[in-house]
Amino acid sequence: MGVFSIANQHIRFAVKLACAIVLALFIGFHFQLETPRWAVLTAAIVAAGPAFAAGGEPYSGAIRYRGMLRIIGTFIGCIAALIIIISMIRAPLLMILVCCVWAGFCTWISSLVRIENSYAWGLSGYTALIIVITIQTEPLLTPQFALERCSEIVIGIGCAILADLLFSPRSIKQEVDRELDSLLVAQYQLMQLCIKHGDSEEVDNAWGDLVRRTAALEGMRSNLNMESSRWVRANRRLKALNTLSLTLITQSCETYLIQNTRPELITDTFRELFETPVETVQDVHRQLKRMRRVIVWTGERETPVTLYSWVGAATRYLLLKRGVISNTKISATEEEILQGEPVVKVESAERHHAMVNFWRTTLSCVLGTLFWLWTGWTSGNGAMVMIAVVTSLAMRLPNPRMVCIDFIYGTLAALPLGLLYFLVIIPNTQQSMLLLCLSLAVLGFFIGIEVQKRRLGSMGALASTINIIVLDNPMTFHFSQFLDSALGQIVGCMLAFIVILLVRDKSKDRTGRVLLNQFVSAAVSAMTTNAARRKENRLPALYQQLFLLMNKFPGDLPKFRLALTMIIAHQRLRDAPIPVNEDLSVFHRQLRRTADHVISAGNDDKRRRYFGQLLDELDIYQEKLRIWEAPPQVTEPVKRLTGMLHKYQNALTDS
């Protein structure tokens, strides 16, 4: 298949995008909106954005959710713009600079919140800047301008959602059902590898793959939740299944680690059971039945705790999986599982990275302002808007440099494409709404094909082309204005790219160290006698951090193993029967305070001092456990944790 060929699976979304653009264009001109371009641009971005991210037609609900975020971001941006203008209308330069800081602040927030919700904050940052720049000549029209922008954006979003519904969006439910079955088989095969205690690299690859697949399943759950309210019960079950999948990974890896020192704990009976190969979820079901019978026969005390916990988690997984597939009413047994433990959210480890993004966005916007004022260029405001858009959207993604390059390619491609529409197509079709709609439908269709292939520059070309062609009411054709707009877009992208190159993001190592210390803090915080604290479910948050660590440091197995060991320590200590008394409770609080000091330390010297203090306190704690006659289920995990912290002290304290 050629580079520019059209695959059958790409056609439906391309038609959907073309329909969204045509609907927005028709409604914009029919209701005599002053700037129908905003409605068309919004419809195109809202529809094409999820397709570019997914690399194909987005699942049902994705476009609707993105549209809602865009509405929220636009309203926040408009309110911020009104407040800034009312407060500083007598100082125009200060007003623009405050808007630059606001754009940076929104980028900072978007770097800390969930990636799905960050779009709203990024959008609110540059919306305020667009409004402030546009009303420079007529500041008294600010409320009217903000209202018009909100109205046209809502119309564009409505058109994108309507087009999505007209062309029967794909449901992700079948994918979820298939993945649940496949994931359970993979979990069983991981436990087989761990029982065999074979090659450590093979085990690392297996559990790493399962962590990624579990994270992907959680993303599917979010999509299913956005799709329809009828999946509420399935959504509740999938939340619990996420924890169960992570529990299965943890128990399997702990089984592998236990055999490093005490291989005799895994009896021949269980070794023989796990030698049976499995291919389907039915095979796993049969094996679990056999294991439950063996556990009843041998007794819980004779069964290794990791295997006992694994079989229990796998059984609960099977029960909830059947409920997800059938979407039936939640039974009493399921409700008991679902009401289990409150999930704890962890503090972001990317605060330094977020601050770098703040400075990148703020400085690039300020640089654009200075460039505009110094040159007096009529399209300097267009360049500033493009700077704000690029930096606000690029900063929240893993590779902002490539996002900038995508925008540069897109704006360069938009120049000849926009020229064709501006000089030839639109002047010859503006008298006929049908021809005008068809001409833009063709543009949307072919770019829609390329967007699904994630072609470099396709997303930027779509937005930039619509932005520079004349879609105003009434239409006016001034070539100098068109050329200024096109060049302003290119210059804005270039300036944003230069700032991103100059303001280096060196936060990667710091983020990695903070993540590892958060794992240590989680393991230490599990040493508690507080019943409410012991019920807290930190497993999803810990694996979310592990997933971030894997993305930041691909292939760094020592870091992954250390993090996984801390997660295992946390789970084991959380279930350990720690003696309940005031002496240990006071010391638990002291340990948690010291672990928090390690995370928040401002430099390496302080961090080393607090980490050394933590190690000393753990030694004292082990002595206290001996005095209070704690059982081996408590003393052994604490000893292993202390040994790991001594071994990796430098990795956890040095920048």
UniProtKB/Swiss-Prot annotation:
A GO BP annotation: carboxylic acid transport
InterPro entries in UniProt: PHBA_efflux_AaeB/fusaric-R (IPR006726), PHBA_efflux_pump_AaeB (IPR023706)
Any coiled-coil regions, as ranges: none
Location within or outside the cell: Cell inner membrane
Gene Ontology CC: plasma membrane
Record-stated family: Belongs to the aromatic acid exporter ArAE (TC 2.A.85) family.
Protein name: p-hydroxybenzoic acid efflux pump subunit AaeB
